[in-house]
UniProtKB/Swiss-Prot annotation:
PROSITE patterns membership: CARBAMOYLTRANSFERASE (PS00097)
GO molecular function: amino acid binding; aspartate carbamoyltransferase activity
Residues spanning the signal sequence: none
Cited SUPFAM superfamilies: Aspartate/ornithine carbamoyltransferase
Organism superkingdom: Bacteria
Main function: Catalyzes the condensation of carbamoyl phosphate and aspartate to form carbamoyl aspartate and inorganic phosphate, the committed step in the de novo pyrimidine nucleotide biosynthesis pathway.
The encoding gene: pyrB
Any Gene Ontology CC annotation: cytosol
Binding positions for carbamoyl phosphate per the UniProt entry: 58-59, 108, 136, 139, 265-266
Family: Belongs to the aspartate/ornithine carbamoyltransferase superfamily. ATCase family.
Pathway it works in: Pyrimidine metabolism; UMP biosynthesis via de novo pathway; (S)-dihydroorotate from bicarbonate: step 2/3
Protein name: Aspartate carbamoyltransferase catalytic subunit
Residues noted as binding L-aspartate in the record, renumbered to the chain: 86, 169, 223
Organism: Anaeromyxobacter sp. (strain K)
Length: 313
């Protein structure tokens, strides 16, 4: 359990204390990643099934790595090689996999609400690895962990989220989590890529990039979610990059010296971020990837019923 939760589906559901429970444990889990032998017996005998209906590099490999470091058995399932291609429904697929008695189902799906639907029909814990444009809770948690690690705290800090906010499940999870940890959130992007009503969550909305990043402690850059966009919402990527992309000159002129830059990946280099910025000293993007393993270890440990001090044994 994470606090009162059997599942990890949306950070909208999580309290400040529950978010801190995960990232505090992740700090301990990260120590395991620094060891020569990256293996602990915490979830020996447990099974984690990764159920991915959408392409993924970082998230699926991160959950698989997290499970294996904790000594759990990990089964990777992809829709292209399954009975889904023969017309099997999501619920039937999940129930058949659950009949194999896994302890945790990790699911990514293009439809918002899919993990919650699955959770209503299975007895094991369910973790959302991203559902449509709804949420991506483990990414939100690893962003919280990375920011706390780099900034010391989120209390009183300002985070700017820039790009295709409307179609970004990462932005939604971050927007639900950051204010609970005391951070102020600014959203910036084209008006056509800004969801309605985000002000009620405490965020301020900007269309001017310089204004949005002025004095920010961290900037999270988002890619354009072409796969979720029907009609064109911007004139073109070149024009988008000129207005909302972050290059070395803008970073040097507009960002304060201590500001760090994050990106959930994959990066469209030369669009939202120039290579010089993505690979530069402000970037903590690869730290996010490493921290993602630690955070997902913490999630699996808490939900699969890891015992005692074995997490750090």
């Amino acid at each position: 359990m994470i606090g009162r939760h059997k599942h990890c589906i949306a950070l909208e559901d999580f309290s400040r204390e529950e978010i801190l429970e995960v990232i505090d444990l992740a700090a301990s889990m990260k120590e395991v990643l620094q060891r020569p032998i990256k293996k602990v017996p915490s979830l020996r005998g447990k099974m984690v099934v990764n159920l991915f209906f959408e392409a993924s590099t970082r998230t699926r490999s991160s959950f698989e790595t997290a499970a294996k470091i904790l000594s759990a058995d990990a089964l990777n399932w992809t829709s292209s090689s399954s009975s889904v291609t023969k017309g099997e429904t999501l619920v039937d697929t999940a129930r058949n996999l659950e009949a194999m008695r896994p302890d945790v189902l990790v699911i990514r799906h293009s439809a918002g609400g899919a993990p919650r639907l699955v959770a209503e029909h299975v007895g094991c814990s369910v973790v959302s690895a991203g559902d449509g444009a709804h949420e991506h809770p483990s990414q939100g948690l690893l962003d919280c962990f990375t920011l706390r690690e780099k900034l010391g705290t989120l209390e009183g800090k300002t985070v700017a989220i820039v790009g295709d906010v409307s179609h970004s499940r990462v932005a939604r999870s971050d927007l639900h989590a950051f204010p609970k940890l005391g951070a102020k959130v600014r959203l910036c992007g084209p008006p056509t890529m800004m969801p309605a009503g985000v002000e009620r969550l405490g965020a301020t909305v900007h269309t001017d990039l310089r204004e949005a990043v002025d004095g920010a402690d961290a900037v999270i850059m988002l890619r354009i979610q072409h796969e979720r966009i029907g009609d064109p919402l911007i004139p073109g990527t070149r024009e988008y990059s000129k207005v909302w992309g972050l290059n070395a000159k803008k970073a040097a002129d507009w960002l304060k010296p201590s500001c760090v830059i994050l990106h959930p990946g994959p990066i469209n280099r030369g669009v939202e971020l120039s290579p010089e910025v993505a690979d530069g000293p402000r970037s903590v993007i690869l730290d996010q990837v490493q921290n993602g393993v630690a955070v997902r270890m913490a999630i699996l440990y808490l939900l699969a019923g890891g015992a005692g001090e074995e997490a750090r044994a």
